[in-house]
């Protein structure tokens, strides 16, 4: 049984996406204010606990072993080093710490046990913990839940049709199955996509429709802007129009009124004025820190200045009960 109260059709979402920008921002902002404290901003900190050497062929990713990029494979980080970085992040104001590993899937080995220990230790710091480890088994998801994991990130990247043009080593169905495993475990899901890869407006609309018609609505919907990386197939991809980014964020807010909408990778491309429009249009979460996995992010001091200028305040950790579904509505 689906847990949201609105059955979104593809045409519904298409109509929202193509609403005149001023009206779309107004509608999205009203929905944000009716479901959240409008001045709250969730600040997330991302740690790459295992960088590079991935066997997959995601066309946008510097960590693929199939491409010649600036990334050199590194061994997995030690528990103490990850916890120390997480502690510093919390001191800087982060309320969620995300752990990313360049794996196709998690394996039942000492490295997975190391992740469990990291999750427990960082949760003890008072921060929500999110992991992105690739595909999971039900047993692994249960272990992560028992360790205290709050959320699991597993993006769909784009529409089913466009996805096939950027990734061949993992199917769309594989990704959907992983989301099902995570939902079954009681862990919240973080799932969104990447814009600016050469996809069409319709691909962005279809991605949101796939997420909106699942049995469980994502707790977080990250919107990433492609960061073209030398050596990857998308290295020469021209930038997407800011207005398309804004439409995607605003549409996500309307369709997922109680989810966090995260302005994620690629935010460094945007001016403070453009980011402000994104916040008005429904984004209420960002990544905090100078680097996101292998790409640049906004300077921490500049972010702090922007947050102060806009009068934003940190969103506390554990604002939504773990695994609690977000109910979509049109109010």
UniProtKB/Swiss-Prot annotation:
InterPro entries: Aldolase_TIM, BATS_dom, Biotin_synth/BioAB, Biotin_synthase, Elp3/MiaA/NifB-like_rSAM, rSAM. Signal peptide: none annotated. Its EC number is 2.8.1.6. SMART domains: BATS (SM00876), Elp3 (SM00729). It is an enzyme of class 2 (transferase). Catalyzes the conversion of dethiobiotin (DTB) to biotin by the insertion of a sulfur atom into dethiobiotin via a radical-based mechanism. This is Biotin synthase. Its cofactor is [4Fe-4S] cluster; [2Fe-2S] cluster. Pfam families: BATS, Radical_SAM. Residues 39-264 form the Radical SAM core domain. Belongs to the radical SAM superfamily. Biotin synthase family. Pathway: Cofactor biosynthesis; biotin biosynthesis; biotin from 7,8-diaminononanoate: step 2/2. The keyword Iron applies. [4Fe-4S] cluster binds at residues 54, 58, 61. Keywords: 2Fe-2S, 4Fe-4S, Biotin biosynthesis, Iron, Iron-sulfur, Metal-binding, S-adenosyl-L-methionine, Transferase. PANTHER family: BIOTIN SYNTHASE, BIOTIN SYNTHASE, MITOCHONDRIAL. It comes from Chlamydia pneumoniae. [2Fe-2S] cluster binds at residues 98, 130, 190, 262. Homodimer. Binds 1 [4Fe-4S] cluster. The cluster is coordinated with 3 cysteines and an exchangeable S-adenosyl-L-methionine. Binds 1 [2Fe-2S] cluster. The cluster is coordinated with 3 cysteines and 1 arginine. Transmembrane segments: none annotated. One of its GO terms (biological process) is biotin biosynthetic process. One of its GO terms (molecular function) is iron ion binding.
